[in-house]
A protein has these predicted regions:
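Short, glycine/charged-enriched secondary-structure capping and boundary segments
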Residues: 22-24, 49-52, 76-79, 107-111
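Active-site oxyanion-binding pockets that recognize sulfate/phosphate
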Residues: 17, 67, 108-111
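Conserved N-terminal glycine/acidic-rich loop preference
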Residues: 32, 70-73, 103-105, 114
């Protein structure tokens, strides 16, 4: 995963995904260091957007803000982030959050503890990205 302290911009969730490649190229040409894509339920997928932005650019770091911990399987999330990081070394920021409670309710993903679910998923993803094996 990337490490950056630069200035970034966000691709708003309301924007049509077809606009992302051109937007990403313009962000990079303008000298920004980071482009953040949003994963919100019922809009567009964050992994697909991150892959699109990375493929359309050469230098800019792309951040995923955020993959909801209770809606994403940790093994699959780690696999997707690892694939992006291998294809675009040093240019990927993976973001994991608890998600919007109302939206998580709508998809039947309400945990007993929001922070507990976030910690469990984040820990599992980190360990998997380090190459560790996990038992569930």
């Amino acid at each position: 995963m990337a490490s950056s302290s630069g200035i970034g911009v966000m691709f708003r969730r309301e924007q049509a995904p077809q606009q992302l490649p051109d937007y990403a190229r313009r962000v990079e040409a303008a000298g920004f260091d980071e482009l953040w894509v949003v994963e919100d339920c019922f809009y567009t997928g964050g992994i697909a957007q991150a892959a699109t932005a990375l493929a359309a650019t050469q230098r800019v770091t792309v951040g995923l803000g955020i993959a909801p911990a209770v809606a994403r399987n940790a093994a699959f999330l780690a696999m997707e982030l690892a694939t992006l990081a291998r294809m675009h070394p040093g240019r990927v920021h993976g973001g994991i959050g608890h998600g919007v409670a109302e939206w998580m309710d709508q998809i039947g993903a309400r945990p007993e503890s929001w922070l507990g679910a976030l910690e469990e998923t984040t820990t599992a993803v980190r360990r998997l990205l380090r190459g560790e094996r996990l038992t569930v």
